[in-house]
Structure formats: C-alpha cells, structure tokens
Amino acid sequence: RVVRVAKEAVATRVTFLRGREEHSVKVEAVLLAAGKAPRVDLGLENAGIEYSPSGIEVNNHLQTSAKHIYAAGDVLGGFGLTHVALMESRIVAHNILNKNKVTPNYQSIPRITYIEPEIASVGMSEDDLIKRDLSYNKSIVPLGIVGRSVIADTRDGFVKILADKKTGRLLGATIAAPSAGEMIHEL
C-alpha cells in the first residue's frame, strides 16, 4: 500500500507498506490511472441531490438525498472501475424494484495493477487485518513450485492467502504473476 509520494531533486520517492514494514523506491514517474472525475456541475441541487466535488452523496443502498433518485458508477467518486459500476447499477436496479434493499460489498472487488508481473488482490489486505486487530493465518506460495509456472518459465511471483484463524474463511488474497488479473477471480 502506497503511503507517501515525495518529489526529490532528481526523482520521486514512493514509500509503501509491505505488511508492517515501510519500504521506499526512487522512480522517474508515478502513474495513477483509474476511472474518471465525476461531473457534478449539472445543477443537481435543483433536483434536491446533495453532492461534493468528489461525487454524488448516497446512502448504503445507493440512494441519493432525493429518495426517488439513485446513483451508481464514476459519479459516486469511488473506485472508478467498470466492474464496480456494473455491480452498483445492478444493486440500484434491485433496490428500485424491491422492498428488501441490498448494499454493495466492496470487499469482493478485485484490484489489479498492470505492471510486470501483474499484481492482483481481492478482499482485505494484511494491513486491513492488522488495523482491525483480526487474527489470521497467512500462506505464501512461490510460483516456482507451481507446475504450470515452471513449464511456462514464469517462476517470479507468488500467491498469498489470508484466512480467518478460527474459521478458515478467506479474508483476502494477492497474486503477483503474469496474468494475475485473470487468476484472481478464482479466489
């Protein structure tokens, strides 16, 4: 998890947490590319919709302050990912048509960083578990022992699983490997 980005004389220093340890690297550039900035300068106040520069304000059921209007996707100012907008739009449709309202579960949204190798994760991170003081087991499997990786000569990487210490329930997972974004859905 990136905790700080600082411009130095010749480069940029990116500081991040790996577990509880802080590390840093010098880079030439930092790119953040996700979603779009929400357009909220449309006179939403005329419809009784509350908003801020970061997006339209909604309750847990994606309902705006105008109770007959719901919102989903980039206009909420959240993740800015297509699959999140799709999930939110399905929840909005359900909540409009049904009395039993449902809420989005953002813990189940996969996240992918397209670098070499790709890094994909889902659920809670180790930092999240530590902050919440949850007891968990951690298992890390290096790609070098996975037969398919050996055959494809892609041994650099790992799969990390975080599970509830008492129940064994999956709490989070990370894959660092070629095509990790395609594999994370299996977890």
Residue ranges, per PLM feature:
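Short acidic, glycine-rich loop/turn motifs
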Residues: 16-20, 60, 165
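A short alpha-helix-loop-beta-strand transition element characteristic
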Residues: 50-52, 99-108, 134-139
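Short, surface-exposed charged micro-motifs
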Residues: 4, 48, 61, 160-162
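FAD-site-proximal beta/loop scaffold in flavoenzymes
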Residues: 24-98, 185
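A conserved FAD-binding loop/helix module that cradles the flavin
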Residues: 72-130
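A conserved short coil-to-beta-strand element within the FAD-binding core of flavoproteins
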Residues: 1-11
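A structured beta-alpha segment of the ubiquitous adenosine-cofactor-binding alpha/beta core
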Residues: 2, 15-24, 36
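Flexible, glycine-rich terminal cap/loop adjacent to redox cofactors
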Residues: 97-98, 114-187
